Amino acid sequence: MDIHGKPIADRIDWLFERARDYSERFCSPENWLARERYLARHPTAIGVLKCMDGRINIPFATRTPLGIVQPFRNLGGIFDLGWPHLGEVLAGYVQRCVRDGRRVLLVITYHFSRGDAHRGCAGFNYDTAAARAHTCRIKAQVESVFGLGHDTVYPIVCGFETDEDALLLHGENGAELDLSRLSGADAPALAQHLAELYPDMPKQTRDDLLPLLAGNLAHIAEIRQ
């Protein structure tokens, strides 16, 4: 359905219907059990800093049960840990996770479109390089606050290509893992790719990131059908 071509009243009704559907699925016994089972197997807490653009739906794009990924949203994905409230919220999130004995993976995202630059992020005037540079600065801030050792809080920069909902992970020295260039047949090699991209990432964190990448490969394949 081309919702963008509908009258505004129909679009508002559609949005509320989506919210009701999301709420019902989130509160269902099946999804609660799926969350508990997932967290028992993958204890790393996953927080995502992202733009308020509704296309950036990480659980949907990675086939992750609802309620696993903790979002932190702002216009354009523009953040500064020097903002008092944001600093308090993020520090509180990390402290709660640490008290529960969990590591934290912070995924700092920007988004772009390969098909049309103007489907990218308006918050950065559709300048993907500027958006990525900003996420790198946020990563540096996270490391300044939570440490460079990465044993407890591990920040990564991740692009989100909105044409195919594909993840683009950035490592050090320009290394990348672009899931749009892989297929489902490459899923068994993801663990090795991650180990090469993030050699200092704790094994448990890598193991808990893997299902998101495998889910994203499956999601991309479905979009391409």
Regions found by a protein language model. Name each.
Residues T44-A45, I68:
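A generic secondary-structure signal marking the coil-to-beta-strand transition
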Residues D53-R55, F112-G115:
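Solvent-exposed loop/turn segments at secondary-structure junctions
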Residues L49, L106-Y110:
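Short, conserved beta-strand edge motifs with alternating hydrophobic and charged residues
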Residues M1-T44, G76-V89, V94-V104, S113-Q225:
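Divalent-metal-activated hydrolytic enzyme cores
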Residues K50-I78:
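Catalytic core of membrane glycerolipid acyltransferases/transacylases, capturing the structured
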